[in-house]
Amino acid sequence: MELGKVGIWWSRPWQAEDTSVDVAAEMEALGYSALWSSGGFQPGLSTFFGHLLAATTHVVVASGIVGIWWTSPEELSKAVADLDDRYPERFLLGLGVSHAPLVEIYTRPYSHMVSYLDALDVARRVVTKDRRVLAGLGPRMLELAGERSAGAHPYFVPAEHTTRARRILGSGSLLAPQVTVVLERNPTKARDLARMFMATYLALPNYTNNLRSLGFGDDDLAGGGSDRLVDAVVCWGDLDAVVAKVREHYEAGADHVCIQVVPTSQGSFPLAEYRQLAPALLAA
């Protein structure tokens, strides 16, 4: 399965203001090589991934991520096998332990992930090591990602984390971080948009603990995030500035980046921004 260099990450409705535009098909036509979306917080594998696959012809569709608390390994394995029957070798399963505030009983997440992977291996369908990635942040989960999956899909991370992740994974594993983009050159507007996006994640201990491990302190995490934190986690500015910041992840060891655009106005899919970004990012 060839993931390519640049994918997009989007968890809200894949619907443009112009309803005649099929967003997934257009992203493929623009040259993005993978479409990532959240697996949600409900049992089962969302049927939405099948819709993305049906709307496209060759891009990889990936879950970023499916939480292991809501669906059994057997059910998930069967759902992925059903997708693979219809769209062979085009679905990449991203798995994660999610976050304690979102899970009713959140105990021993690392051990639970190990057991989950064991069960997927026993199921012997299509969710083999090379067809899955883990949402690794900390060293233990990153090590597990390298040992038991194709690699890691970290979310809400600066390039410094990409450097660390590559060191832990070694040279043979996939590293595909989510990278947040705000295509706005005004610093005040850009950081305001970034902070609105970041608010959800700064309330989740897995993310804040990870940021602390990278040297960010209480002052950085308070008040929606310091300028230093915003500038580290979010690539903002004009096109050249954004591409330069995204390139830092490649230089730090990323094989593939999953670009999540924060819209400059609330509403539908940021189609204009992804159109503007595509030629520059694909040439980076």
Which sequence ranges carry the predicted segments?
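Active-site-adjacent structural elements that line small-molecule/cofactor binding pockets in enzymes
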Residues: 1-284
